[in-house]
Amino acid sequence: MSDAKKLTGAGLRGQSAGETALSTVGVSGSGLTYRGYDVKDLAENATFEEVAYLILYGELPTTAQLAAYKTKLKGMRGLPQALKEVLERIPADAHPMDVMRTGCSMLGNLEAEHSFSEQSQIADRLLAAFPSIICYWYRFSHDGVRIDTETDDDQIGAHFLHLLHGKAPSALHTKVMDVSLILYAEHEFNASTFTARVCASTLSDMHSCVTGAIGSLRGPLHGGANEAAMELIQDMKDEADARDVLMGKLERKEKIMGFGHAIYRDSDPRNAIIKEWSEKLAADYGDDRLYRVSVACEALMWEQKKLFCNADFFHASAYHFMGIPTKLFTPIFVCSRVTGWTAHVMEQRSNNRIIRPSADYVGVSPRKVIPIANR
């Protein structure tokens, strides 16, 4: 690595890899802000469309700007016939993140970014189209139905649920999906976002950057924690069973997903927000078992390991109460985080230098080639 500055720590933990004006994560041990606004404030007082506008365009919209933005996004929900045909060829047992990756890449073939002047338009298009992509594939491959991907729903969260279930969602479900999308919208230099920025630093197109980010999120160490949490809690009978199951896993030193975080030291601010909504959903659902066992898991993990729930853990029960199949949990993350990814791509482009770090060589010493007859 010669004169390059030495970066230490597994996975470059604690290292600064650049500057961003989009978000802060864990500055006080537990905080999360988007362009200066606390995520709790946004979740309580804004919609996801307002937050998307904030992240992509820099400020919260006025009433007129929000109305125009919602109208724009609603007009971008439809999918090209060629993309639908590709989605119909993807089997039902495919990994849904592969569907998202393929859908994004195919859209890039059909609606290519010819100039960076189109970047905001493409960011909005991806934000509007991603729920349509995953739901069109799911409904066709699992139900044999070719759905109309354009609905009159005012919000993206409601639109997703409408496409998935074939009917308009309740006010409660609409609100919870809206909050969920806000909580997942942006999170600084995580693995998928940094992947998008590295790709952007080569001056690649927006679809390639986002496709790369999806590929990064597909890995189980980054995405999928809410799916793993659902697999953990779904068969727990009650609080006592939850404690027994978790204690067994701890004794066997098994990794338990949905707890702790790479950046937050004290708590994940998103957890308390979605936990509250999960409790409300449980009451509405009429069976609070999954919520109760989740609370028991949370208490035990803190008691035994001093590990707090991250954003993913109570999302599992919340999504379940809204009738969302477990395999679609991570694609919902994509439908939200595409906001942050595309904003980071644009930020990288605005003050760009190709990201090309050095590496410490740990291989063999210099040597000579031995003729093949003598090896």
UniProtKB/Swiss-Prot annotation:
Keywords: Transferase, Tricarboxylic acid cycle. It catalyses: propanoyl-CoA + oxaloacetate + H2O = (2S,3S)-2-methylcitrate + CoA + H(+); oxaloacetate + acetyl-CoA + H2O = citrate + CoA + H(+). The active site is at residues 222, 261, 312. Pathway: Organic acid metabolism; propanoate degradation; Carbohydrate metabolism; tricarboxylic acid cycle; isocitrate from oxaloacetate: step 1/2. One of its GO terms (cellular component) is cytoplasm. CoA binds at residues 255-259. One of its GO terms (molecular function) is citrate (Si)-synthase activity. It holds the Pfam family Citrate_synt. One of its GO terms (biological process) is propionate metabolic process, methylcitrate cycle. NCBIfam families: cit_synth_II (TIGR01800), PRK12351.1 (NF009006). Homodimer. Belongs to the citrate synthase family. PANTHER family: CITRATE SYNTHASE, CITRATE SYNTHASE-RELATED PROTEIN DDB_G0287281. Involved in the catabolism of short chain fatty acids (SCFA) via the tricarboxylic acid (TCA)(acetyl degradation route) and via the 2-methylcitrate cycle II (propionate degradation route). Catalyzes the Claisen condensation of propionyl-CoA and oxaloacetate (OAA) to yield 2-methylcitrate (2-MC) and CoA. Catalyzes the condensation of oxaloacetate with acetyl-CoA. This is 2-methylcitrate synthase. It comes from Shewanella oneidensis (strain ATCC 700550 / JCM 31522 / CIP 106686 / LMG 19005 / NCIMB 14063 / MR-1). The gene is prpC.
